Amino acid sequence: RVGVIDEGGVNNNNNNINFIPAENYSIIQKIKQQDLFINIASMQEMDLPIVNNYLRFMRDERHNSPLFYCCNRISKRLPDGGVICFDDYGWRADDTIIFDELCEWYQRYPKTVPFGWRDFDSPIRYKLVYLNSR
């Protein structure tokens, strides 16, 4: 079963997978133990303090060193002129990295006029890591 957790929701124990909309990221600190977190192409849209909060919430001791799959641009200029960088996301030296490399399957996106594909302005990187909760 799959569910969406909104701002008033809590983890539904009947669901195998729960989606949390980006604007409700603070819910992560309220949910029961999770084994896996996935973020694809949205941390690159956030300011670094928000990204660091995500990781802090995921590192909560309830989650017992969860797996985190992160797939985002290496760097991106935000609308306010700031730059967000994958390497600055709050990774720690005591995290256990499974892989960390360029993502071959997500380097382009569809465009409509003219129809075709366009490369992102920065390569996409993905990382699978056990986040140390201690």
Region locations from a protein language model:
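A short, conserved alpha-helix within the catalytic core of class I
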Residues: 45-58
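Flexible loop/turn segments at secondary-structure boundaries
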Residues: 26-27, 45-47, 76-79
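S-adenosyl-L-methionine
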Residues: 1-31
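Short, conserved loop/helix-junction motifs that constitute active-site signature segments
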Residues: 31-32, 57-64
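Hydrophobic adenine-recognition pocket in adenosine-nucleotide-binding enzymes
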Residues: 42
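A conserved beta-strand element that flanks and buttresses the S-adenosyl-L-methionine
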Residues: 37-38
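Conserved beta-strand signature within the Rossmann-like core of class I S-adenosyl-L-methionine
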Residues: 62-78, 84
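Rossmann-like AdoMet/SAM-dependent catalytic core
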Residues: 88-134
